[in-house]
């Protein structure tokens, strides 16, 4: 019986550090952000759906999605925002489901990294949910270093997300990513041993 583990956490919580480590250990990881990127690439299903809806004005000269223009159009009205969410979420969910079902045929244990796993009701897909937990101070520090955000921008990004405490209710396992990378890897190793022995 395949075990499917969902990985989630707030922005700059260190999900990619953990998923890269899982890949190094030989596990398959479906990355929702990468799936979205693939779908939005020229000719992808999301690309086609957005062009059909909003027209070629959302494309740049190379024929790729002009993300600033797209954001401007989507966020210009509540109706556009609602339609965009509905359209994109349906296509993304279908693609994630297809990839999940493919891996379930060949893998004993695999992982899916979905940043909005809890908020967008993916919970029933998983045997377990791992929440990557870090302090808001750590997230802000990483956002400033990694994304070049100001203190205010970083705080705004955090404020727009579901709080960690609210997410903890849905988590089966919590990986504390406040300390060193080595410490985090030790926690992951411990969880992997437990999964393999069950």
UniProtKB/Swiss-Prot annotation:
Q: Superkingdom of the source?
A: Bacteria
> Where, per UniProt, does this protein localize?
Cytoplasm
Q: Name one GO cellular component term.
A: cytoplasm
The protein's GO terms of the molecular function aspect are: ATP binding; dephospho-CoA kinase activity
Q: What is its EC number?
A: 2.7.1.24
Pathway field: Cofactor biosynthesis; coenzyme A biosynthesis; CoA from (R)-pantothenate: step 5/5
Listed InterPro entries: Depp_CoAkinase, P-loop_NTPase
**Name listed for the protein in its UniProt record:** Dephospho-CoA kinase
Q: A single GO BP annotation from the record?
A: coenzyme A biosynthetic process
Q: Which UniProt keywords apply?
A: ATP-binding, Coenzyme A biosynthesis, Cytoplasm, Kinase, Nucleotide-binding, Transferase
Amino acids binding ATP: 12-17
PANTHER family per record? BIFUNCTIONAL COENZYME A SYNTHASE-RELATED, DEPHOSPHO-COA KINASE-RELATED
Q: DPCK domain: from which residue to which, for each copy? A: 4-198
What's this protein's family per the entry? Belongs to the CoaE family.
Substrates-to-products reaction catalysed: 3'-dephospho-CoA + ATP = ADP + CoA + H(+)
Q: Which HAMAP family does this chain map to?
A: Dephospho_CoA_kinase
Q: Which Pfam families match?
A: CoaE (PF01121)
User: What does the record give as the function of this protein?
Assistant: Catalyzes the phosphorylation of the 3'-hydroxyl group of dephosphocoenzyme A to form coenzyme A.
Q: What is its main location?
A: cytoplasm
Q: What class of enzyme is it?
A: transferase
């Amino acid at each position: 019986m395949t075990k499917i583990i969902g990985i989630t956490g707030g922005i700059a919580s260190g999900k990619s550090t953990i998923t890269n480590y899982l890949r190094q250990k030989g596990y398959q990881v479906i990355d929702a952000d990468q799936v979205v990127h693939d779908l939005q690439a020229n000719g992808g299903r999301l690309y086609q759906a957005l062009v059909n809806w909003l027209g070629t004005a959302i494309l740049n000269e190379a024929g790729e999605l002009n993300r600033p223009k797209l954001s401007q159009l989507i966020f210009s009205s509540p109706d556009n925002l609602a339609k965009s969410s509905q359209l994109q979420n349906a296509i993304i969910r279908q693609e994630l489901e297809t990839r999940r079902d493919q891996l379930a045929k060949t893998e004993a244990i695999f992982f899916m990294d979905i940043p909005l796993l809890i908020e967008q009701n993916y919970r029933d897909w998983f045997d377990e949910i791992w929440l990557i937990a870090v302090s808001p101070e750590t997230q802000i520090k990483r956002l400033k270093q990694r994304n070049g955000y100001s203190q205010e921008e970083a705080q705004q990004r955090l404020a727009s997300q579901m709080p960690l405490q609210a997410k903890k209710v849905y988590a089966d396992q919590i990986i504390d990513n406040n300390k060193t990378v080595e410490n985090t890897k030790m926690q992951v190793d411990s969880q992997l041993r437990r999964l393999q022995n069950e």
